[in-house]
């Protein structure tokens, strides 16, 4: 039974990451988001698992993982926003912050688009989500801002060749290029 539930989570998280255009290394956020939303949605009897556990309906705004949202950044980040720039900044929705015991106090997790700019290109890039109380999201116009770059990297018909810097600092092309010698000596 538990293996089936784990598989259900995997089967829900994989397409969520793909749809959002976010790399698999952000699976921890996707798993938490999937489990939260799954528990907040009603089941056969019309009640949600959240309602059964907490005795009341979940008041969270249910937002797709990786969807475009607007939010006011944390006070430290808000100080660097230009004076006449909009206070709400575009970002990507990463989920819900839960306290120990699964209690939700109204905090959402989001990352600024500017902080995610290279997340699909650089596997070492760290992200620092903002824990915020208010998110602006339009369910009639769902957008996934990271999707385009994800598709460019993962679904190119002619992906760029693998390169490494040569002895002179210039890139060298590796692979089956014209003039490559067969490793067997022929």
Regions from the language model: what does each represent?
Residues 1-186:
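Nucleic-acid-interacting cores, centered on viral/eukaryotic replication and modification enzymes
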């Amino acid at each position: 039974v538990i293996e089936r539930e784990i598989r259900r989570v995997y089967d829900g998280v994989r397409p969520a990451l793909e749809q959002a255009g976010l790399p698999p290394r952000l699976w921890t956020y996707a798993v938490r988001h999937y489990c939260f939303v799954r528990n907040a949605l009603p089941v056969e009897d019309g009640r949600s698992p959240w309602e059964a556990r907490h005795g009341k309906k979940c008041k969270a705004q249910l937002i797709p993982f990786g969807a475009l949202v607007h939010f006011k950044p944390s006070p430290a980040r808000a100080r660097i926003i230009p004076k006449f720039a909009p206070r709400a900044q575009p970002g990507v929705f990463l989920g819900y912050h839960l306290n120990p015991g699964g209690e939700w106090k109204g905090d959402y997790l989001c990352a600024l688009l500017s902080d995610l700019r290279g997340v699909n290109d650089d596997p070492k890039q760290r992200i620092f989500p903002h824990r915020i109380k208010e998110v602006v999201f339009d369910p009639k116009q769902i957008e996934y801002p990271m999707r385009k770059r994800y598709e460019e990297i993962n679904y190119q018909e002619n992906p760029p060749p693998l390169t490494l810097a040569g002895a002179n600092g210039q890139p060298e092309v590796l692979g089956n290029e014209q003039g490559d010698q067969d490793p067997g000596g022929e």
